[in-house]
Regions:
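Hydrophobic ligand-binding cavity/cleft-lining segments
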Residues: 1-37
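Intrinsic-disorder/low-complexity, polar/charged segments enriched in Ser/Thr/Lys/Arg/Asp/Glu/Gln
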Residues: 3-7, 45, 57, 69, ...
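Beta-strand/loop substructures that line and gate deep hydrophobic ligand-binding cavities in soluble
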Residues: 75-130, 139-141
Length: 149
């Protein structure tokens, strides 16, 4: 099964990056641009909303939340996202930096949709990076590069 992989260096402490990924308010700041519903603690479920949608684009279950790793299992979402696993691995880098290893694993097959998702993940991870470093985020729709209708 193919996976989406990204590696990002962030000039911010692991704890700050973790907080932006592990809580629904943080996720909204760098990714969705609007509030999530549910809870992002271990075992929790949260819905991801974009634009003016009434229904979540995806529902995630938090399967890991440690200082060095956060994982979400996709329980609802676009067909090819179902049952995939999104993992953020955080490692200290230097005195105050973080290396983020991102994996969106378990895709059934490589596809044009998957490549577009990879492009957008790169943009949203850049939003996470710049937000953690400077407080300036570019969530959806500003951060979206590849549009799917």
């Amino acid at each position: 099964m193919p996976d989406i992989l990204h590696r990002i260096s962030i000039d911010a402490p692991v704890a700050r990056v973790h907080d932006l990924i592990a809580g629904t308010e943080g996720i909204a700041r760098w990714w969705t641009g609007r509030p999530l519903d549910g809870s992002a603690g271990i075992g929790g479920r949260f819905g991801v909303y974009f634009a003016d949608a009434d229904k979540p684009a995806a529902v995630m279950r938090v399967t890991a939340d440690t200082p060095g790793e956060i994982s979400w299992r996709v329980e609802q979402g676009p067909g090819s996202w179902l049952d995939t696993l999104i993992t953020f691995t955080l490692r200290p880098h230097g005195e105050e930096g973080t290396t983020l290893l991102f994996t969106h694993a378990g895709w059934q097959e490589a596809s044009e949709f998957m490549s577009g998702c990879s492009t957008n993940w790169g943009a949203y991870l850049t939003s996470l990076k710049t937000g953690a470093e400077s407080g300036r985020f570019t969530p959806y729709p500003q951060g979206e590069i590849s549009r799917w209708s």
